[in-house]
């Protein structure tokens, strides 16, 4: 079935259905893909019927049911022999879907000459898919940009247009000398992007501000017009709101006419840098560009030219010192400072040497102090011991007895501690031996696992080499495949169909052979059953004659009757077992068939659609109540 599904999917792709590459069987078909495949086939078979059907599954449940019923009616009109309804499209099962798609694929128009000449490679399929996509996009009606839904936006490839919303920008202006007055407004003036928080309005605001600057540049010779244009967007105007736009339009046209000359005059190619220099020459002539620090320094410390001239005039010329005397005094002062620096450096070196020597002496003294403290502690301990001994000398006998008692108690205490140690030592030693044994077992297990890991590494290396070899073979086969002709002719499909027919013929022969063997076995069973019945009848008659005269023969007759009954039960049990096994196989086939129909998934889809339909009905009822 997989081979037949692949051939059927290939036919659907040729009909224009966008089947994903990962879909290889009909079991993986979704509801959307089933609807698209059926609509594409109907459009190819009967364009009049298929053109009125959408290949996209609508989101509303009522629209889905109407589309499914329309598809079912169209297929029935084509002569589909089986029963067909909306459930075959919304909740498809694999056998019914295969029958329907085979019915539609058989009715697809075929042209032998066209199929023979047309290539069937991946590139040709890709080009046909592109053509079908372009045809679908051209078949869609044009919708104005403001009325397009997001889905139509994706299909028609256009973006939503935004309205022109601008805001007033406050930027540093030019003074009479052409310098930006940033030092006056820098603490309070925000950058242009921060003045317009909306991202969509930044470009519009900058364009409007630049247009105002352009008008100011054009009307620089007319102060009245300049002020009017400058404050047009800042103050409320009482005139017609279209008047500023018309005036701006006329000014731009006049500026372009003056810049580029009359229409009949030859146009002169100008560089962009020259145009910018020409536009800003009037404002920036003779004024060097400085940083904010230089501007603030000029504003803070530089005096006006008139004040500076007055101060310079008040200073007498005779009070200025000669330049040579000033240089000599500076050199003498520099020499004296150098001498002072040298003496200070010498003093610093001497102090550093003294500090090093004192540090070494300090370390030595600290070491001697520690040693003396240790010796004093030892002497104090010896002194305490001797003082205790001297205190015990007046009552020597009693103290000696007490000392012996203390020694004996110490010995008893040592014995008691030794016994306690033995009590603790024995379980600890046993635990140690147990842990040692566990450690040895773990070491053995670790060594065994290490050997297994080494063997695994070797097998991994062998597998890597095998994979590398297979990769080389794969590359070689791919290169050979690339050298083969790309176009797949009808001969390959014919050869494959003949192979399938041959396999079917072999299966039919095997089935016929199995049936004949079954018939022979049935005949043999019947003959053996008849022979068994006749044998039992003859034996029963012979034994029954002698059973009246002899007790042993009577017992044999009873055993014969019991054997016959048991054999009959055994044969009946075997027949019942065969019947049950046959029924089990039939039930397994039915289970596989039901599993192929995807009953559980279809039930889940039906429940989801039922909930969606109830929500739609509730929404419609709410709208009706509102109306």
UniProtKB/Swiss-Prot annotation:
Sites bearing Phosphoserine, chain numbering: 410
Alphabetical UniProt keywords: Coiled coil, Cytoplasm, Cytoskeleton, Endosome, Phosphoprotein, Protein transport, Transport, Ubl conjugation pathway
Pfam family, one: CCDC22_N
UniProt KW Phosphoprotein keyword: yes
Positions of region (Sufficicient and required for interaction with CCDC93): 1-447
Highest taxon of source: Eukaryota
Region (Sufficient for interaction with COMMD1) location: 1-321
Subcellular location: Endosome; Cytoplasm, Cytoskeleton, Microtubule organizing center, Centrosome
GO cellular component, one term: centrosome
GO biological process: endocytic recycling; Golgi to plasma membrane transport; intracellular copper ion homeostasis; negative regulation of canonical NF-kappaB signal transduction; positive regulation of canonical NF-kappaB signal transduction; positive regulation of ubiquitin-dependent protein catabolic process; protein transport
GO molecular function, one term: cullin family protein binding
InterPro entries: CCDC22 (IPR008530), CCDC22_CC (IPR048348), CCDC22_N (IPR048349)
Coiled coil: 321-384, 448-535
Keyword flag Coiled coil: yes
Record's subunit section: Component of the commander complex consisting of the CCC subcomplex and the retriever subcomplex. Component of the CCC (COMMD/CCDC22/CCDC93) subcomplex consisting of COMMD1, COMMD2, COMMD3, COMMD4, COMMD5, COMMD6, COMMD7, COMMD8, COMMD9, COMMD10, CCDC22 and CCDC93. Forms a coiled-coil heterodimer with CCDC22; this heterodimer interacts with the guanine nucleotide exchange factor DENND10; the interaction is direct. Interacts with CUL1, CUL2, CUL3, SKP1, BTRC. Interacts with SNX17 and SNX31. Interacts with CPNE1 and CPNE4.
Its job: Component of the commander complex that is essential for endosomal recycling of transmembrane cargos; the Commander complex is composed of composed of the CCC subcomplex and the retriever subcomplex. Component of the CCC complex, which is involved in the regulation of endosomal recycling of surface proteins, including integrins, signaling receptor and channels. Involved in regulation of NF-kappa-B signaling.
Family to which the UniProt record says this protein belongs: Belongs to the CCDC22 family.
Name listed for the protein in its UniProt record: Coiled-coil domain-containing protein 22
Organism: Rattus norvegicus (Rat)
């Amino acid at each position: 079935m997989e081979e037949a599904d692949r051939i059927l999917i290939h036919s659907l792709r040729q009909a224009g259905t966008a089947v994903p590459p990962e879909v290889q069987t009909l079991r993986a078909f979704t509801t959307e893909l089933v609807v698209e495949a059926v609509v594409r086939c109907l459009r190819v078979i009967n364009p009049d019927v298929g053109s009125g059907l959408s290949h996209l599954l609508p989101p509303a449940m009522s629209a889905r049911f109407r589309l499914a019923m329309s598809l079912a009616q169209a297929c029935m009109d084509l002569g589909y022999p089986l029963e067909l309804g909306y459930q075959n499209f919304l909740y498809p099962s694999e056998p019914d879907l295969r029958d329907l798609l085979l019915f539609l694929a058989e009715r697809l128009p075929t042209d032998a000459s066209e199929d023979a000449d047309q290539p069937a490679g991946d590139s040709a399929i890709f080009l046909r898919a592109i053509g079908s996509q372009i045809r679908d996009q051209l078949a869609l009606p044009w919708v104005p940009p403001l009325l397009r839904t997001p889905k139509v936006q994706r299909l028609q490839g256009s973006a939503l247009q935004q309205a022109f919303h601008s805001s007033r920008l406050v930027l540093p202006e030019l003074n009479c000398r052409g310098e930006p007055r940033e030092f006056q407004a820098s603490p309070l003036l925000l950058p242009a992007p921060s003045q317009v928080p909306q991202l969509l309005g930044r470009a519009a605001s900058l364009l409007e501000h630049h247009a105002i600057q352009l008008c100011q540049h054009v009307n620089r010779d007319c102060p009245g017009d300049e002020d009017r244009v400058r404050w047009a967007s800042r103050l409320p105007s009482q005139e017609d709101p279209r008047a500023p736009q018309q005036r701006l339009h006329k000014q731009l046209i006049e500026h372009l006419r003056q810049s580029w000359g009359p229409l009949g005059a030859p146009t002169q190619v100008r560089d962009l840098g020259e145009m910018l220099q020409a536009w800003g020459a009037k404002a920036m002539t003779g004024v060097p560009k400085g940083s904010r620090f230089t501007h603030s320094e000029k504003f803070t410390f530089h005096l006006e030219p008139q004040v500076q001239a007055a101060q310079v005039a008040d200073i007498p010329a005779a009070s200025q010192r000669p330049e040579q005397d000033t240089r000599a005094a500076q050199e003498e002062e520099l020499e004296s400072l150098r001498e002072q620096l040298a003496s200070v450096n010498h003093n610093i070196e001497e102090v550093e040497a003294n500090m090093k020597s004192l540090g070494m002496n300090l370390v030595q003294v600290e070491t001697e102090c520690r040693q003396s403290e240790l010796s004093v502690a030892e002497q104090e301990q010896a002194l305490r011991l001797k003082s205790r001994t001297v205190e015990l000398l007046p009552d020597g006998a009693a103290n000696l007895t007490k000392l012996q008692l203390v020694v004996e108690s110490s010995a008893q205490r040592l014995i008691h501690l030794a016994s306690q140690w033995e009590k603790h030592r024995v379980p600890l030693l046993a635990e140690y031996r147990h842990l040692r044994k566990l450690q040895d077992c773990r070491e053995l297990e670790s060594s065994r696992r290490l050997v297994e890991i080494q063997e695994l590494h070797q097998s991994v290396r062998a597998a890597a080499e095998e994979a590398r070899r297979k990769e080389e073979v794969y590359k070689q086969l791919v290169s050979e495949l690339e050298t083969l002709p790309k176009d797949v002719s009808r001969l390959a499909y014919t050869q494959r169909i003949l192979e399938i027919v041959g396999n079917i013929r072999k299966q039919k022969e095997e089935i016929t052979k199995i049936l004949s063997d079954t018939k022979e076995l049935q005949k043999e069973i019947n003959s053996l059953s008849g022979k068994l019945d006749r044998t039992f009848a003859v034996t029963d008659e012979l034994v029954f004659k002698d059973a009246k005269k002899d007790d042993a023969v009577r017992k044999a007759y009873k055993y014969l009757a019991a054997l016959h009954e048991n054999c009959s039960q055994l044969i009946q049990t075997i027949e019942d077992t065969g019947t049950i096994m046959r029924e089990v196989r039939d039930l397994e086939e039915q289970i596989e068939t039901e599993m192929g129909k995807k009953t559980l998934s279809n039930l889940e889809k039906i429940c989801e659609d039922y909930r969606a339909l109830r929500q739609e009905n509730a929404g419609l009822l709410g709208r009706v109540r509102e109306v």
